[in-house]
A protein has these predicted regions:
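Alpha-helical transmembrane-bundle signature of multi-pass membrane transport and export proteins
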Residues: 1-424
């Protein structure tokens, strides 16, 4: 694809690749199911315990194992077939989801048992997500990589919109058991898609040496390039202070707005709907904007959205704040993700993405755990507002310390984005 052809269209052009389109569509359905479960788990845990500390603990136990397993999965995915790894992880995650459904319908579920199942699934998910991020790039040509990354982000965020919305309806009409079952069944689509697609040949890293040695090589590469280290630092802090707030949504719905399960699903869905809106914007105009500019807009918008959520006087305002948070987060996360993908060679890709995702996955549980505990000691609104203000301070620091985030604009692959200087 020529430079002129690439700039004449949008990122949606990559859906003309049959394998990418098939995998993308199946992933959208399956991840929608996963988000249904993600919403249903804290809902039932909070329903059983009425504790924000339990909410934070459940999120912590979900994300921490993924953070631990992710780097090892990245090392393995750089040395072995990523398609084969995904076939195994998707199968195990399907079995785990059916187990969660079975414990709930048989009435043996307890908060501890639910968290234990989620904890196990988190380890597998850590290997799955790092491999997934690298595998997607094998379904397109090298000069389409950035478009594929953007569409993959759009798919994840679309699922984040549809999943909570459907979960709210399902929880209201049929209960948590149906939400758990639909998620488990959705894995069949991804397994079928994996059997169908034929990825590009993979550039394998050296299969010798230890896993820790491979991880050290990946970390040295990250530390040697500000264009890699900066987005990894940013996504970790954003997860710690920004998106971790979403894990408190059941308490926000109940304690701040006094609404039920359907409205709770809509509150979380608003974040996803905002993210879908942002992903459409990114897919259509991002080639004409610097990643640094988009990231700056995103982190400031997310910070202000978190503050607005904490100050929201009514449910409708809270929904609007979540929409803004989702839109801003998508702008930021896509810029950071594509910034990393554009600056790493294929033989290092899974390891570097594992470090990136570990930063993200560490921030969410730590933030949720601390915020959940603080919310039991002080006002929930104060905790949320404080998180937003702290994130805004971090945004100012990175803007000043790293030349308005210009390292994000560096690239090893494809044409550089057209520079659109800021007005003024």
């Amino acid at each position: 694809m020529s430079d002129a052809e690439r700039r004449s269209g949008t990122s949606f052009r990559v859906l003309r690749r049959r394998d990418f389109a098939v995998f993308w569509s199946a992933a959208l359905v399956s991840n929608t199911g996963s988000w249904m479960q993600t919403i249903a788990v804290p809902f039932v845990v909070y329903q059983m315990t009425r504790s924000t500390a339990w909410l934070g603990f459940a999120a912590f136990m979900n994300f921490i194992p993924a953070m631990i397993a992710g780097p090892f999965g990245g090392s393995y995915a750089d040395r072995h077939s990523r398609k084969g790894i995904l076939l195994v992880t998707q199968t195990v995650m399907m079995i785990s989801s059916f187990t969660l459904w079975a414990t709930w319908v048989t009435g043996v579920a307890t908060p501890g048992l639910i968290v234990a199942i989620v904890f196990f699934s988190g380890f597998v998910a850590g290997i799955n997500i790092t491999t997934w991020q690298a595998f997607v790039t094998q379904l397109v040509e090298p000069d389409e990589l950035v478009d594929a990354v953007r569409l993959n982000s759009m798919q994840f965020m679309g699922a984040r919109a549809f999943g909570p919305a459907i979960a709210g309806i399902v929880l209201q009409a049929a209960g948590a058991s149906t939400a758990f079952f639909l998620n488990a069944a959705s894995f069949v689509l991804v397994l079928a898609a994996l059997a169908f697609v034929h990825p590009r040949s993979q550039v394998f890293s050296d299969t010798g040496g230890s896993v820790l040695g491979h991880l050290r090589d990946g970390w040295r590469l990250v530390r040697s390039r500000t264009s890699l280290f900066l987005p990894i630092l940013m996504i970790g802090v954003v997860s710690l202070l920004g998106t971790s707030v979403i894990q408190l949504a059941p308490a926000i719905a109940k304690e701040m707005f006094s609404v039920g399960r359907g409205a709770y699903g809509l509150l979380v869905a608003a974040f996803g709907i905002g993210a879908v809106t942002g992903s459409v914007m990114v897919a259509t105009i991002a080639d004409r904007m610097l990643r640094s500019l988009v990231a700056n807009i995103g982190i400031v918008g997310l910070s202000l959205g978190v503050v607005a959520l904490g100050l929201a006087p009514a449910y409708g305002v809270g929904v609007a704040a979540m929409f803004v948070m989702g839109l801003a987060y998508l702008l930021l996360a896509t810029s950071l993700n594509t910034g990393v993908q554009a600056r790493v060679e294929d033989e290092y890709r899974a390891r570097v993405m594992a470090i990136y995702l570990s930063s993200l996955l560490l921030g969410v549980p730590l933030g949720s755990l601390v915020q959940g505990k603080l919310a039991e000691w002080v006002d929930l609104r104060a905790v949320i507002v404080g998180s937003g203000v702290a994130l805004l301070g971090f945004a100012a620091y990175t803007w000043l310390r790293h030349a308005r985030l210009r390292p994000l604009d560096e690239s090893l692959i494809g044409p550089a984005p057209t520079a659109v200087p800021p007005v003024g």
